[in-house]
Amino acid sequence: MQVLVDADACPAVIKDMLFRAARRAEICVTLVANQFLRTPPSPFIKAVQVPAGFDVADARIVELVEAGDLVITADIPLAAAVLDKGAHALDPRGNWFSRENIEERLSTRAMMDQLRSAGIDTGGPAPFSARDGKAFASQLDRFLARHGKP
């Protein structure tokens, strides 16, 4: 089991939590981004830089992910692709993507895209909060307790 991170938009505090978890649980954490990422020295942490371009990092994550892996992303289409491969998907706010909720989330995303295309200001997500970080840490710990190294 490995953890893959859609790192371009992942909050720094979440990356730091993942770095600590990698060392503590001795699991591989791979950050994928289209920019250089500084990572702490560890045999369990690596960064993969992909060329700039629309969904290039997402495509690389889909290529690397295997059934049972965990992917950290807020990208709903990427989460859907990851679920299709039998992996798990968690957003940086501690919310799980699942077979039960992914279609609704894709539909909501499509509707919001249509509203924005029509010139309607739909706002954006709330700023990342300490509560979001705590929710993520809790879900990550639970996942690693169930699926981490034996």
UniProtKB/Swiss-Prot annotation:
Domain of life: Bacteria
Coiled-coil intervals: none
InterPro entries: UPF0178
One Pfam entry name: DUF188
Family stated for the protein in its record: Belongs to the UPF0178 family.
Protein name (Swiss-Prot/TrEMBL): UPF0178 protein Bcep18194_A4809
